[in-house]
Amino acid sequence: VVICVIVPVHNTPKPWLADAVNSIRRQTYPHWHLLLVNDGSTEVGTREFLDNLNDPKITKIQLTRSVGISIATQTGVDAAHGDFIALMDHDDMLAPDALKKVAEIIQRHQSDVIYTDETTFSDRTQEKRDGYLGLPHLKPAYSPDLLLSHNYITHLLVIRKEMIQRAGGFRAEFDGAQDYDLLLRVAEQTDKIFHLSEPLYHWRQSVQSTSLDTGAKPLAHLRGQKALSEALERRKIPGEVLTANAPHFFRVRRKVLGRPSVEIIIPFRDQPLMLRQCIDALMSNTRYDGFRVLGVDNGSVEALTLELKDHYERETDQVRFISLDVPFNFSQIVNFGVQHAKGDHVVLMNNDIEVINVDWLEAMLEHSQRPEIGAVGAKLYYPDDTIQHAGIAIGIGDYAGHPHKHVEGGYPGYLNRLHNIQNVSAVTGAMMMIKRDVYDAAGGFDEQLFKIACNDVDFCLRLRSKGLLNLFTPYAQAYHHESVSRGYEDTPEKQVRFQGEVEAFRKRHAEA
C-alpha cells in the first residue's frame, strides 16, 4: 500500500517545517511519498528550506499565489500517486511507526478511512498548563453521532484517494473546517472507518498557530456549522444545527416525525413518596403530550401506596397500574411492563428518577425514532448535582462502568464528552428509551441469567450485535436517587448473586 502524505505549506517557520518533513523521512514503513504544496509562501526561511530539499520520495508543488488550505490540499490529492492520502499540517509530526501501523490496518480490515489518537505538544513559546507534551486526545471507535457533534477525528487522518474524489474533494468555501466537511461527505460513501487507538500524531500548539485558541476561529466554527447543515440536507434529515456549549461543538436537533406514542414503564414496590416524586415530575416537567405512565407494582403492601395508585387513576387517564406478584426479578418486571405497554416507544424508568428539563422526552425521541438506533440513554445526576450516568463503557469496574461518575455536573468532561450526543456501548436501564418493536425483536431483558444486575448492559450489547447503535444524549436530564429503591448489593447473598451475574455477563460478552 502506497501512502501519500500531503502537507500544504504556507510561511512555516523553517525549524517546524524541518521537524514535519524529518518525521516522515524517519518512518519505518518504506512505501510512502511526501507531497509538499507551497501555497504562495513569502517567508525567506520557508522558501529556502524547500529549495534545498532534494529527495526522490518528496515532490514539491509551487503555487504562484496563496489559494488557501482547501485548494492547496486538493492540488496535492490530484497529483498524488498512492492509493491512500494521509493529511498532515505543516508544523506537526508523525510518530516513527505511524504509517506502518496504518498500512497494517488497511491490509487487515480493507478500511477506507483510518484515524489515530494524537498528543499535543508546545513549542515552549508560552507556558501551557499541561507542560511540553500536552493532553493526549484518545478517541472512541467510529461514532457517527459524535461526528455530528464535532470533528473528533482530526489527526492523523488517512483516506482512500478514490473516496476523496468520489465525495467531491476539498471545497474552498469551508477553509478552516475543510477536513470536517470532507469527512462528513466521505462518511456518506463508506462505513469502513477504523480507529487506530494509539497516539501516532503530534500536534504542535504555539502562539503563532491558531490551534491553541479556538475562539480565534469564529469563521471556522460557522463553516463547520454550514458543513453540518449541508450534511443534514444531503442525508434528508429534517432538523437544525445549533451551537453546543463551546466553539466547534454542535447539536444536531432532529425533528420528531409525526406524534409517536410513548409509554413510560416504572417498576416499584411501595416507597410511595418516591413514586409520587417520580410521577409528579413527569406530569409537570414533560412538554410532549403523547405519553402515558404504566406503573408495574411488584408486591406493594403499604396503605399509602394503594391510596396513591387510586389517586392517580381517579385524577388522570395518563397513569395506570398493573401488578406482578413474584419474587424480585427486575428483568421479568420490566418485560411484563413492556408486554402491557401500548406505545410505539417505551421508556424504562426507575421509581427513583426525577426528570429535570421539559423537553427531555423529545430529546430522546428524536433519536429513538431513527431506524439505526437501539437504546437511547439520558444524562443522570446524583441529588448533589454530580454525574451519575453519561453512557456506559465495557471493561471498567467488574464488567462495565460509568465514565465521569461523580464529576461536577457542569464539567464538560473529557474532550467535552459530557455535552455531546454520541454513540456508546450501553446506557442504563434506569432511564432508557427504545422502540417497542425493537425491544420485542431483541427478546427483552434476560430473565434467566440477569435477574437483577447486568441486564441493561447485556440488552444493549445484544442490540449492538444486531447492527444497531446505542446513544447517549446530554439533552435529556434527570436526577437519579440511585439504589434508594432497592438498596445496594450489601448482603453476602446479594454479593454471591451479583458475582454470578457478572460471570455470566463476562462469558456471554467476552468479545466486547
Task: Show which residues each predicted segment covers.
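C-terminal, non-catalytic tails of nucleotide-sugar-dependent glycosyltransferases
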Residues: V1, A216-R259, G374, D384, ...
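Glycine-rich, basic loop-to-helix element that forms the pyrophosphate-binding segment
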Residues: L63-A80, L324-A341
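Conserved donor NDP-sugar-binding/catalytic core segment of glycosyltransferases
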Residues: D97-Y132, I353-D398
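A conserved acidic beta->alpha catalytic loop
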Residues: P30, N38-R47, R65, D297-L308, ...
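A short, conserved alpha-helix in the catalytic core of glycosyltransferases
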Residues: M163-R166, E173-P199, L228, W360-M364, ...
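A recurrent flexible, glycine/aromatic-enriched loop bordering the glycosyltransferase active site
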Residues: S70, D78, L133-V158, E162, ...
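Short aromatic/hydrophobic "clamp" motif used to bind/position activated sugar donors
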Residues: I85, V346
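Short, acidic, metal-binding catalytic loop of nucleotide-sugar glycosyltransferases
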Residues: N22-H31, D280-G290
